[in-house]
Swiss-Prot record:
One of its GO terms (cellular component) is ribonucleoprotein complex. The lineage of its organism: Bacteria, Bacillati, Mycoplasmatota, Mollicutes, Acholeplasmatales. Belongs to the universal ribosomal protein uS19 family. One of its GO terms (molecular function) is rRNA binding. The keyword rRNA-binding applies. It comes from the Bacteria. Protein S19 forms a complex with S13 that binds strongly to the 16S ribosomal RNA. This is Small ribosomal subunit protein uS19. It comes from Clover proliferation phytoplasma. Keywords: Ribonucleoprotein, Ribosomal protein, RNA-binding, rRNA-binding. The gene is rpsS.
Amino acid sequence: FRGHAKGDKKNQKK
């Protein structure tokens, strides 16, 4: 995750 608990659901690139 990018380290965000608010947009980690859509930012699972890492």
